[in-house]
């Protein structure tokens, strides 16, 4: 989220076709898996029957956000000429700064799993040990294949590059 907001912010400096295509390609690269990853992350906390209502909240919120940002865009387009920038440049800059703030906040607030909610600056996690066991058991009863989720490992830059360049995907 942070990477795509930085690239999107750079869109306010686009000057031609090549910069447009470069920005859009990088946006697609960084933003492409966001929804799928968000659904996967939410599935760590909710059973399949609970997940559908949470995802409906996500999609409704997305639609409402698009309505609100359209109204904001109308006002921002009237900023044309300020600082030597066009209205569309201001729009990219302002909207993406909000995305950057949300991305940085998400980095600090989102946790890897139900049992890993403690942060260095917080002595308590989100749940008590009993609540963690209840949630984990509920998730495993709903989908036993999630029992091997704990074998995750960090991704190196080499592994990332192999994934990007694998043309069999």
Curated annotation (Swiss-Prot):
Gene3D superfamilies: MFS general substrate transporter like domains
Protein species of origin: Saccharomyces cerevisiae (strain ATCC 204508 / S288c) (Baker's yeast)
Biological-process GO terms, alphabetical: transmembrane transport
GO molecular function: transmembrane transporter activity
Protein known as: Putative uncharacterized transporter YOL163W
Cellular compartments annotated: Membrane
PANTHER family in UniProt: MAJOR FACILITATOR SUPERFAMILY (MFS) PROFILE DOMAIN-CONTAINING PROTEIN, PERMEASE-RELATED
Entry's family note: Belongs to the major facilitator superfamily. Allantoate permease family.
Bilayer disposition of the protein: Multi-pass membrane protein
Keyword DNA damage: no
Cross-referenced InterPro entries: MFS_trans_sf
Stretches that traverse the bilayer: 25-45, 57-77, 91-111
Keywords recorded for this protein, A-Z: Membrane, Transmembrane, Transmembrane helix, Transport
GO CC terms of this entry: membrane
